[in-house]
């Protein structure tokens, strides 16, 4: 089969490729990479390191070291291993969207060597449908197998893959033999209709299905099938520390009070949590709590999801990807039949759909880089200038959730940086989208409060003790000397950031 480097024996082919017309299209990763044209818009599977292209994109990065070729790369979210780094370092990227989490690519973005479009994750497909961004030329989709009609059985994520395959002129499929052939039945793939008069998305509970368990494709589009045998890059799960434990305790106490006043029950409403150690730790806190029969309607299902399944606290989880540690991944694979009926993976325009988030009454828990005394949140930029990763799905949930919660440490880097400041250096989520703010110091419930009331609650409950006096003094001076609905002293609003730049500390 065209010098394919990975052995494709008869048994493997019978298991993985059930559509006979594809058998003549098995090629190597290098051959597939050679099919990518300069200036192509490539839509590749992958969402938070799960279900991504593990051989074709790395092979294209290698090719770009020797040839003057570059592409626009659109994925679901971040890619695993060093793929984004390899592409950036070989100058293989013209544009990148909608999310990334790689240090080398981040450097290229901040040097404007790669044009980065930081999008709400629910909007990428919408913009492709409407023609707001250039259409997909070539889709690269990871699969566990191909069914009798040539359709793709996805792996550990869906992301934007279903629409990429629908819109692309050409498709390359990576069949990953590390994923068991029985890893199917958990996917719910649907391609949205165009405007006008689009149908509603008929999801009323996290368990509802509206699509198919495979990605439907036109077999004539398929250029090649590449076999790989590489697992997803494992997530690094940090043990909860005193900061994340405190944040979790504050949130659990808040939920207890909401139950006591009759606003919620001990099953709460469907939970969403962003990626990362803080959100994962917060969810872990439910494990030893009174909260039972929980459900999730989220983007990324992390280790905490499976810990809560095993502890009996969580009944069902819907997401767009499964991004877990090596140990948790093996537990999932070994016990897949046990977990199968508790999981759904959806396209990210469905998992993050504002329509569904509002209908289900999601409790959204996302991580902030910093927030200010009036409740505005910065999720993306360091000191207002340098891109960190991207807004991801936090905005999809924040504006539409039943409860919009943002969490972060009160201070970091030996307390040289305060994460609560007079004015955020970059706005991702305005005060209008934020209900609850939580740090290790405490929780600020901002619902129904005017700006000055919010400032009092945030300063009292969320600011680190080493910064509280100065931030309170700033606020009181702003009230006295400037006044207004949202008092600010523009000459001093960013003094914490300028001090950090000049001295290496906000103190």
Language-model segment annotations:
Residues 4-507:
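Conserved alpha/beta enzyme-core scaffold
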